[in-house]
């Protein structure tokens, strides 16, 4: 049966995902940045309360995946922290300036991760040559690759995803970006074994007093009284679709 991973941005969201049938959680901070390394407090809280596998993302900032020496040092420290806390896996990725996998740095990450399952995230979708990159990741011992098939969403990239899945000895290929209940059957029918979804919704803040003339964001037009949360009903719906597909 296909595995359902839900992207979560808080302990509460991780619990919601677990309660509604998620098989695994990718734990992040900063949804508007596409996911950054969670704080130590969030990591510890989730480790204590969530019982399904949780893989934290290790990404020090938004933007591209070519990092300074200081940023890479922080990545290694975060990898060691996640390992010490007892998480079963993590999610990360580093590229060179030419769009290829930074093999020396990824080798250091793999050594620091030790027995943890390492997912190479959507840095893969920004690489210059996906098949060469897949060979590199196979050589590194990466467990899985999260990809949209180098398109803006995974449904558009499904043909490339299937090409990657067919690649001999490849890591697990997990489809992600725009995967939701209404298009999930396309991935299941194609034989995708792992899918990644935010199953998210924007929820109004409980704040009653609101200073509308002031923003804490660099985007002056951002609505800071909305919070991104996991929609438990959406997770349950996707899990039900997977189970019914398996029963066919």
Swiss-Prot record:
Identify the keywords attached in UniProt to this record, alphabetized. Answer: Cytoplasm
Superkingdom of the source? Bacteria
What cellular component terms from Gene Ontology apply here? cytoplasm
Q: Which InterPro entries match?
A: CutC-like (IPR005627), CutC-like_dom_sf (IPR036822)
Kindly list the places in or outside the cell where this protein is found, as annotated in its UniProt entry.
Answer: Cytoplasm
Listed HAMAP family = CutC
Q: How does it assemble?
A: Homodimer.
This chain belongs to which protein, by name?
Answer: PF03932 family protein CutC
* Native source organism of the sequence: Escherichia coli O1:K1 / APEC
Name the gene behind this protein.
cutC
């Amino acid at each position: 049966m296909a595995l359902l991973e839900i992207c979560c941005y808080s302990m509460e969201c991780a619990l919601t995902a677990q309660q509604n049938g998620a098989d695994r959680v990718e734990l992040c901070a900063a949804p508007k940045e596409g996911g950054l390394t969670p704080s130590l407090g969030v990591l510890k809280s989730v480790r204590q309360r969530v019982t399904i596998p949780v893989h934290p993302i290790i990404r020090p900032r938004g933007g591209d995946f070519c990092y300074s020496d200081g940023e890479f040092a922080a990545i290694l420290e975060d990898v060691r922290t996640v390992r010490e806390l007892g998480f079963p896996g993590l999610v990360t990725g580093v590229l060179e300036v030419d769009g290829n996998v930074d093999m020396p740095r990824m080798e250091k990450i793999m050594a620091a991760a030790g027995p943890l399952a390492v997912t190479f995230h959507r840095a893969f979708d920004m690489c210059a040559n996906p098949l060469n990159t897949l060979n590199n990741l196979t050589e590194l011992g990466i467990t899985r690759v999260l990809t949209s098939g180098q398109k803006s969403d995974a449904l558009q990239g499904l043909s490339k995803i299937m090409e990657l899945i067919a690649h001999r000895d490849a890591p697990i290929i997990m489809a992600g970006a725009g995967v939701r209940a209404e298009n999930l059957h396309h991935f299941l029918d194609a034989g995708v074994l792992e899918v990644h979804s935010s199953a998210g919704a924007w929820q109004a803040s409980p704040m009653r007093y609101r200073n509308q003339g002031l923003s804490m964001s660099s985007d002056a037009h951002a609505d800071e009284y909305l919070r991104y949360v996991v929609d438990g009903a959406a997770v349950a719906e996707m899990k039900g679709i997977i189970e019914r597909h398996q029963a066919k």
